[in-house]
Amino acid sequence: MRVSRLMLNTLRDVPAEADIISHQLLVRGGYVKRLTGGIYAYMPLLWKVLKKITSIVEEELSTKGCLQTLLPQLQPSEIWERSGRWKSYTKGEGIMFSLKDRQGKELGLGPTHEEVITQIISQTIHSYKQLPINIFQIQTKFRDEIRPRFGLMRSREFIMKDAYSFHANENDLQSTYSDMRNAYENIFTKCGLDFVCVDADSGAIGGAASQEFMVTAESGEDLILISSDSKYGANQEKAVSIIEEGKLLEPNKPSIIKTPNQKTIDELCNYNDFHPSQIVKVLAYLATCDDNKKYPVLVSIRGDQEINDIKLSNKISQELKQNVLDIRIISNEDMQKQGISNIPFGFIGPDLSDNLLAQSKAWEKKFIRIADNSAKDLKSFICGNNIKDEHKIFYNWNLINTVQMICDIRKAKPGDRCIHDKTQKLQECRGIEIGHIFQLGTKYSKSLNATFTNEKGVEDHFWMGCYGIGISRLAQAAVEQNHDDLGIIWPTSIAPFTVIIIIANIKNNDQKCLAEDIYQKLIQDRVDVLLDDRDERAGIKFKDADLIGIPWRIVAGREASSGLVELHNRKTKITELLDLNSVFKKLSEEFNTEKL
């Protein structure tokens, strides 16, 4: 390919809409063009990158016996309603684009394909003898992101690889899950990425277990917690840990104390010489579920800990057997709208009376009461007395016996001790999710009644796994991890071109002829090569080459008449003056090929 025919359009200035460096460089390098918020055109340079990533993915999955397919992007609402996900994906903060056809039938524009593939497999696979099977596709997905940002990191239209496996039993699922994890490790290694695999929350996809593959980057949206021995890692949404023992509050006669205007943990401790770990703080949440009901929730946790909203939402879903569409802390405005005026925020205890909800217009009339393990382990504690400016002291759970659920809803944090080894502590880093694998179990096969005949001749539900890779996101994540002040530094395996040849002076015949000879030789040997044949100053060509990040640069310059060229490595920044045989030998060694 010649630059004069590439439609290359580079920018010197940082685009105003780009917040992180990878987004800035993709725009400046002419890799993407923004159409509107969260929607981008993949320009020819990026399309070559995406095709190389896709090729690596397809090659690796084929070695695992996966079959490639292409599923419909338009999906009928009926199958999503049967799985119980239609409301959670289209209401509240749901991310599915939905529409109606001419007949008034509701359709969704596929953000994911669990329902579709489950229905198809149930109509196609009938016996355990046909299992296991693993099917994948690579296609455009659509998600109505509330806040699309960071370019391809969180866009409303993107390219994704999603695979779905079907099994006769759990052991077979776990075997394939392990194989797919290995395949993902191979894929991301071949793409030249530094990554970690961590435990993750399954979110709206669901299932018993899941893991995320994260590219480590300071700009990552996700906080990852990793043990100091690297034997445990998890997204903070999922992470578990052992907290340090707090300061003991010696048991004494339970009593009520006056605490005027001491609404916060800090105020309460500063005025009374308490320690946050001696306090049970209680927060009031409101959970909206897909049964259209709103459930008030009282959550108790040790005063020096924070609530993990993801864990809390999951526990409420399990308790109610409903999907939680939205969960948030109840505000004074919420109370006023419900006609409730006497809940003393800042002084709430775990035993706040359900009678206060009798006045509510649209909420359920009883609190769901949940206590984190950190609070339930306290033998003597301080908590609100449900009256303004009053707290209880030296109370225990025998005196306040109102909790329905005791579980882990605490947010693990850096410095906490590790579950697998108490001598190890959690450390934090930030990451960009590029892959996610799930053990779905029978979640979808049961809801969609997808069955097969097992070895005993009995109808049984499929065991399922699903496995996603964000192809377009991976491309930008690679840039986030591989760049410098001059521009992108693509890993060779996914670079749009492996080599760029620059003619320093297009009017110099020696330089043109030498560059053309090298160009034809590399094409003959199937090297992905770009020839900068523009009538531009050499400095502009060098800046563009650095910006777009081609791994190797050959410059036909002043020494061309002597048959010498400069060979420059974009990553190491090492430049050598070599004859052509030495150039071809060097590149052959780098590309592990016998040609050149």
Swiss-Prot record:
Pfam families: HGTP_anticodon (PF03129), tRNA-synt_2b (PF00587), tRNA_edit (PF04073). It is found in: Cytoplasm. Its EC number is 6.1.1.15. Keywords: Aminoacyl-tRNA synthetase, ATP-binding, Cytoplasm, Ligase, Nucleotide-binding, Protein biosynthesis. One of its GO terms (molecular function) is aminoacyl-tRNA deacylase activity. Gene3D superfamilies: Anticodon-binding domain, Bira Bifunctional Protein, Domain 2. It catalyses: tRNA(Pro) + L-proline + ATP = L-prolyl-tRNA(Pro) + AMP + diphosphate. One of its GO terms (biological process) is prolyl-tRNA aminoacylation. GO terms for cellular component: cytosol. InterPro entries: aa-tRNA-synt_IIb, aa-tRNA-synth_II, aa-tRNA-synth_II/BPL/LPL, Anticodon-bd, Anticodon-bd_dom_sf, Pro-tRNA-ligase_IIa, Pro-tRNA-synth_IIa_bac-type, Pro-tRNA-Synthase_IIa_type1. It is an enzyme of class 6 (ligase). The keyword Acyltransferase does not apply. Homodimer. PANTHER family: MITOCHONDRIAL RIBOSOME PROTEIN L39/PROLYL-TRNA LIGASE FAMILY MEMBER, PROLINE--TRNA LIGASE. Catalyzes the attachment of proline to tRNA(Pro) in a two-step reaction: proline is first activated by ATP to form Pro-AMP and then transferred to the acceptor end of tRNA(Pro). As ProRS can inadvertently accommodate and process non-cognate amino acids such as alanine and cysteine, to avoid such errors it has two additional distinct editing activities against alanine. One activity is designated as 'pretransfer' editing and involves the tRNA(Pro)-independent hydrolysis of activated Ala-AMP. Belongs to the class-II aminoacyl-tRNA synthetase family. ProS type 1 subfamily. Consists of three domains: the N-terminal catalytic domain, the editing domain and the C-terminal anticodon-binding domain. This is Proline--tRNA ligase. The gene is proS.
